[in-house]
C-alpha cells in the first residue's frame, strides 16, 4: 500500500499503519484487523499536493512535510507518526505507538511539538502524552499500561528490580504500586508465547518454565512483594473484569 501511494502521489507520506510497520512500531493484530475491515487509510501529505479525500483514503495535510525514507518508501518521522497516531487512533493502540517511540529515543518534547505544529492536539492526544512512558518493553506491556489507565488506576512504577535475599537473583517486575497501608502490589503480564515459543523456553520443558515462574514468584515474595497478580493479553480486552481483579487487591485509583 505505501509503495502504491508513493507511485500515485509524490506528496503522500504514507498511511498510519504502514508507517508503524515500516518502523517496526508496536501495533497489535486486532488494531490492524480493524483497519483492514474498514478499508480506510489515513495519509499524511505535504502542502504542495492537490489530491482530495476519497472513499478509502483520508488525507491529513502536513505543514512541515517532514519525512524519512524507510525501505525506499517515504514515511513521516517517528515523532510525527506518534503524534498522528495519538490524535487519530483509540487510546490503547495510540499508547502502544507512543511508548514505542519514547523507548526508541524519540523525546516527548519532539512529539508534542509536532502535534502542536500540525494542529493534532485533541483530548485523546493529551491523554496519550500524559501517560505514555519509555519503560514498556513491548507492545503488550504498553497496552496493559493503557488498559490500567482506562480502568482508572494510578500510573504504576515499571521495571522495578528486586533482589531475592535467599538466592541473590534479580527480578524486574512489569508494574508496581504501593498501597496506602504499605503493601507492594505487582502485576505481571504473562504471554502464552513464553509457554510455546522454543526460543523463549530456552531449551526448557513446559514443566520447567512453570517451575521457573513459581521460583520467580517465591523470590519476589521473599524480596518484599506482598501481592502478585498475573494477567494475560485477553484480560486487556475485558476492562471491567481487569478493574475488579486489581481493585480487590488494593491497587490505588488515580486522583482526577
Predicted regions and their residues:
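Short gly/ser-rich loop at a beta-strand->alpha-helix junction or flexible surface loop bordering the NTP-binding
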Residues: 1-121, 128, 254-256
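Surface segments flanking catalytic/ligand-binding clefts of nucleic-acid enzymes
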Residues: 102-256
Amino acid at each position: 500500500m505505501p509503495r502504491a501511494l508513493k507511485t500515485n502521489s509524490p506528496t503522500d507520506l504514507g498511511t498510519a499503519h504502514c508507517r508503524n510497520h515500516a518502523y517496526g512500531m508496536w501495533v497489535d493484530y486486532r488494531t490492524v484487523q480493524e483497519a483492514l475491515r474498514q478499508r480506510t487509510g489515513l495519509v499524511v501529505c505535504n502542502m504542495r499536493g492537490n489530491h482530495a479525500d476519497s472513499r478509502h483514503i483520508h488525507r491529513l495535510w502536513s505543514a512541515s512535510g517532514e519525512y524519512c525514507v524507510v525501505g525506499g518508501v517515504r514515511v513521516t518521522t517517528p515523532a510525527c507518526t506518534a503524534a498522528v497516531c495519538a490524535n487519530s487512533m483509540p487510546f490503547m493502540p495510540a499508547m502502544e505507538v507512543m511508548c514505542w517511540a519514547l523507548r526508541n529515543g524519540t523525546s516527548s518534547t519532539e512529539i508534542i511539538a509536532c502535534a502542536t505544529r500540525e494542529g493534532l492536539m485533541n483530548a485523546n492526544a493529551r491523554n496519550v502524552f500524559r501517560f505514555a512512558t519509555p519503560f514498556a518493553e513491548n507492545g503488550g506491556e504498553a497496552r496493559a499500561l493503557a488498559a490500567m489507565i482506562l480502568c482508572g488506576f494510578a500510573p504504576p512504577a515499571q521495571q522495578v528490580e528486586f533482589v531475592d535475599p535467599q538466592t541473590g537473583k534479580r527480578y524486574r517486575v512489569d508494574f508496581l504500586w504501593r498501597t496506602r497501608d504499605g503493601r507492594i502490589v505487582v502485576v505481571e503480564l504473562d504471554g502464552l508465547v513464553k509457554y510455546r515459543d522454543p526460543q523463549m523456553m530456552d531449551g526448557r520443558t513446559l514443566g520447567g518454565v512453570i517451575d521457573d515462574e513459581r521460583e520467580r514468584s517465591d523470590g519476589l515474595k521473599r524480596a518484599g512483594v506482598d501481592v502478585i497478580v498475573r494477567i494475560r493479553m485477553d484480560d486487556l480486552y475485558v476492562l471491567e473484569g481487569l478493574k475488579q481483579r486489581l481493585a480487590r487487591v488494593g491497587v490505588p485509583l488515580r486522583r482526577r
